[in-house]
Design a protein with these regions (language model features):
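Exported/extracytosolic protein signature
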Residues: 1-172
Length: 172
């Protein structure tokens, strides 16, 4: 009697019995807690895969406040500049290996309409997660923590630049 034997098994979908799909952690940071009009803020978002499996098709989107404006061509993913990407439109950051992370950063300028205001900012990550092999993947949305920057009324900052020069002896 010829019996069929399984010689190779291939897994196409990553799934888990974690029903809420919380395998991604998102943390957001801003470089300045206090700023003035026309100052540049750098936002950094760390997306960590906390699972044992590689994740794919992760989409990043940032909801930029009306008090700041994104500076074109400042998006970096893991330190590499990604020209043409816009956090407000969103973009794919690709796969994240198990227990690894991707670091996204970008710059924005503080607008004049922001004096005496608090700039609030957060980001979102979207991905598909399958916890049951018999069902379609579920779209998961994870919002980062909010970061805050207080804006001063000061429009210009004073910079003091000093340099001591020694005059040649023949000029004294």
């Amino acid at each position: 009697m010829d019996a069929m034997r399984i010689t190779k098994t291939t897994f196409n979908d990553v799934f888990s019995n974690d029903a809420n799909g919380s395998i991604i952690k998102v943390e957001k940071y801003v470089d300045k807690k206090c700023a003035s009009v026309f100052e540049i803020l750098t936002y950094t978002i760390i997306v960590t895969n906390t699972s044992r499996y590689k994740t794919g098709n992760i989409f990043f989107k940032d909801y930029i406040s009306k008090y700041i404006e994104f500076i074109n061509n400042t998006v970096k993913v893991n330190g590499i500049i990604k020209r043409g990407l816009d956090p407000q439109q969103g973009f794919y950051i690709g796969r994240i290996d198990a227990s690894c992370k991707k670091i996204i950063s970008f710059k924005s300028v503080v607008l004049p309409n922001s004096a005496h205001r608090i700039i609030k900012n957060s980001a979102n990550i979207y991905y598909y997660y399958k916890c049951n092999l018999d069902k379609f993947p579920t779209r998961i949305s994870i919002e980062s923590n909010r970061v805050y920057t207080n804006v001063n009324k000061i429009v210009f900052k004073q910079l003091n630049i000093s340099n001591t020069l020694k005059a040649p002896k023949n000029l004294r």
